[in-house]
Amino acid sequence: MKLLTNKIIEDFEKQGLTGELPDSEKKVIAKYFFPIGSTIWYALEYNPKENEFFGYIVKSGHNELGYFELEELEYVTIDGLRVERDLDWESNTTLEEVKRGDKE
């Protein structure tokens, strides 16, 4: 599965930097998850020069904003399983909705 498509890159470019926006206006462009375990990466921004995302990371009940790399997502493998992109994710979902638990 391709984790980063041209369409997703275009959506990141349209949104731009989100630092000054309220959570209700920050669009979560892509959602990545590991099939076993509880880690979810909600990507808000993407820096193509660094192949790095900025987003909201949920891991074992600890939620934080931070950076994560595309390479990190592509190469993590446990028992033959890899990180996947949620193909049904709606990129108009806001960070506020994710934090409230309205969208998972």
What are these model-predicted stretches?
Residues 1-104:
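Catalytic phosphate/metal-binding cores of nucleic-acid and nucleotide-processing enzymes, i.e., regions
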